[in-house]
């Protein structure tokens, strides 16, 4: 029997609250930030207070609780009546598999909040295409816009134009990190908040991990899909700020398309037999590093091998490469929340008549290794490996040979 829309909403609600309130420190901090920003209250109001069958009435107000009594006929869990708002997400690599869970997050938030969305932008980090799509969204009367700010200055005017037209704009996944000396002379567009990873700081944490894995004086390769774009360049800047002077460092551009990245890594590997560390700052390059080592049958140092390797994000091949010993680690930045939370932030801004902002949420830099990979072996909508709302076990969770 097919589930009703309300049953699906309740299922999403339970999963989202669980997703942001798991017990590790970064997620507890995220939950605290959400609560301070008014987001959890909005989630609970939209999801339903009681997570039981059907809706439950709102609690009666009292001087101790500070909760006002509900209006007659009000049912907790109902979204306040509003037009069907359209939210446009402008992305820099629209077909990249990293953003599959991001799109699921947008879909789920729109289902819960009775909104529509459009996913558009560039497939190859082309800023002009992104700006054109943003201007089109403004002219076509979008109710809210979320944009990955991958380049200084380019998004200033369209962001201000949107705000002038009464359209809220939030940044997600990428912003201009002024804590990175390479970007300190720039500024961010006048968006209302940013939801995503703290990019430069994440790179510095990554650099410390390299120091622990690779002997000083060795050759280290840093792979980056698109040098100079603000979604990943700050990571490599952060890494280099920590490891410079310790290694011979090769920075290798791999290209915006996942299909090209592994070829670039293979070419580098074949011409540098002395390399002792291979690290990537984007999802496709990370997958490529693990795949190249797998093809050559070379395990990483934490698995008894000779080369250290790691990167970012949780593509299915990356997860399996960690399990099988061809990557030492990867970093989870929770792409699902980078879709869900901007949608919710725009909704709260609109429903509150501009009261709920600014909102800045760091979605984290959680190191995933063989010792804590187990939860990620489940097929999960929240990591992009399934469409199901409840994570389920898979048949590929055990180590394979090679």
Curated annotation (Swiss-Prot):
Pfam family, one: Peripla_BP_4
Membrane-crossing segments per the record: 38-58
Its membrane topology: Single-pass membrane protein
Signals that turn on the gene: Up-regulated in the presence of D-xylose, L-arabinose and D-arabinose.
Compartments reported by the entry: Cell membrane
Description of the deletion phenotype: Deletion of the gene results in a growth defect on D-xylose and L-arabinose.
Gene3D superfamilies referenced in this protein's UniProt entry, alphabetically: 3.40.50.2300
GO molecular function: carbohydrate binding
First-listed, main subcellular location of the protein, grouped into a coarse class: membrane
GO CC annotation terms, alphabetical: plasma membrane
Protein role: Part of the ABC transporter complex XylFGH involved in the uptake of xylose and arabinose.
Family of this protein: Belongs to the bacterial solute-binding protein 2 family.
PANTHER family referenced in this protein's UniProt entry, alphabetically: ABC TRANSPORTER PERIPLASMIC-BINDING PROTEIN YPHF, D-XYLOSE-BINDING PERIPLASMIC PROTEIN
Subunit: The complex is composed of two ATP-binding proteins (XylG), two transmembrane proteins (XylH) and a solute-binding protein (XylF).
Record protein name field: Xylose/arabinose-binding protein XylF
Taxonomic lineage from the root: Archaea, Thermoproteota, Thermoprotei, Sulfolobales, Sulfolobaceae
């Amino acid at each position: 029997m097919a589930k009703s829309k309300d049953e699906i909403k309740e299922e999403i609600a339970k999963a989202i609250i669980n997703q942001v309130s798991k017990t590790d420190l970064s997620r507890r901090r995220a939950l605290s930030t959400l609560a301070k920003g008014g987001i959890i209250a909005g989630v609970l109001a939209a999801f339903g207070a009681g997570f039981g069958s059907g809706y439950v009435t709102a609690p009666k107000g009292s001087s101790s609780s500070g909760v006002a009594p509900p209006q007659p006929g009000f049912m907790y869990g109902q979204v306040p009546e509003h037009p069907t708002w359209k939210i446009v997400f402008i992305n820099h690599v629209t077909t990249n598999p990293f953003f599959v869970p991001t799109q699921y997050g947008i879909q789920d938030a729109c289902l819960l909040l009775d909104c529509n969305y459009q996913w558009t932008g560039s497939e190859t980090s082309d800023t002009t295409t992104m700006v054109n799509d943003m201007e089109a969204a403004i002219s076509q009367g979008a109710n809210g816009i979320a944009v990955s700010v991958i380049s200084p200055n380019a998004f200033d005017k369209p962001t201000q134009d949107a705000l002038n037209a009464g359209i809220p704009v939030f940044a997600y996944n990428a912003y201009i990190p002024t804590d990175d000396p390479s970007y300190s002379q720039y500024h961010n567009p006048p968006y209302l908040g940013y939801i995503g990873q703290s990019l430069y700081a994440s790179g510095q944490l990554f650099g410390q991990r390299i120091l622990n894995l690779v002997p000083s004086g060795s050759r280290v390769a840093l792979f980056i899909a698109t040098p100079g774009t603000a979604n990943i360049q700050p990571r490599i800047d952060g890494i280099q700020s920590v490891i410079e002077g310790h290694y011979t460092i090769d920075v290798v551009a791999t290209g915006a398309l996942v299909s090209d990245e592994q070829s670039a890594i293979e070419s580098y590997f074949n011409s540098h037999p002395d390399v002792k560390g291979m690290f990537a700052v984007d999802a496709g390059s990370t997958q490529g590093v693990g795949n190249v080592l797998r093809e050559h049958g070379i395990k990483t140092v934490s698995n008894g091998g000779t080369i250290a390797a790691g990167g970012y994000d949780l593509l299915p091949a990356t997860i399996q490469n960690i399990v099988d010993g061809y990557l030492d680690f990867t970093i989870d930045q929770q792409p699902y929340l980078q879709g869900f939370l901007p949608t919710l932030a725009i909704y709260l801004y609109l429903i509150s008549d501009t009261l709920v902002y600014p909102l800045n949420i760091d979605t984290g830099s959680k190191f995933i290794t063989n010792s804590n990979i187990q939860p990620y072996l489940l097929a999960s909508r929240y990591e992009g490996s399934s469409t199901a709302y409840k994570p389920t076990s898979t048949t590929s969770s055990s180590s394979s040979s090679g």
